[in-house]
Amino acid sequence: MSWPPQVIVVAVDGSDQSQRAADLAASLARAHTSRLVMITVVRPPEGWWGVTGQPPSPEALSEALVEGQQEILRQAENRTDLSGIEYGTAEELGDPTSVILAACERESADLLVVGRRGAGLVERMVMGSVADRLAHHSPVPILIVP
């Protein structure tokens, strides 16, 4: 672990809690001259069918999901004070826990910042909290923001 952190990864999903996490991560990045990576991840819906009754092509589904993720990132960027911070963004498809952990490894993160609860109530009820799974499996220190 490196302190102060050189690279901070923050996961955003459009929820108020993830925005608070982004704000805190940006403050830490500014205070420590750290690089900030904002990531959003969406799990492709299983068995999703389009209005035609036919499954969408993987390309069409990926494009629609990525557009939604890009909007989440745009909103987070617009709502977060990123002045004076070196930062990047990433949008990915897959299991949020696995993808966020892989991003921490890929970016050589020193700190992961997440909101306590995300936007998906049903996912939390069925699969548990992403923050909880990250807390149990993160190879880097994790800051969970209420």
Please identify what each model-predicted range represents:
Residues 1-4, 78-112:
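Structural beta-alpha unit
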Residues 2-55, 83-90:
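Small/aliphatic-rich secondary-structure junction motif
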Residues 40-41, 115-117, 146:
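Short secondary-structure boundary segments
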Residues 53-57, 106-108, 130-131:
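Short, hinge-like loop/turn segments at secondary-structure boundaries
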Residues 56-71:
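A short acidic, glycine-rich active-site loop
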Residues 111-136:
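Glycine-rich, Arg-bearing micro-motifs that act as flexible, cationic patches
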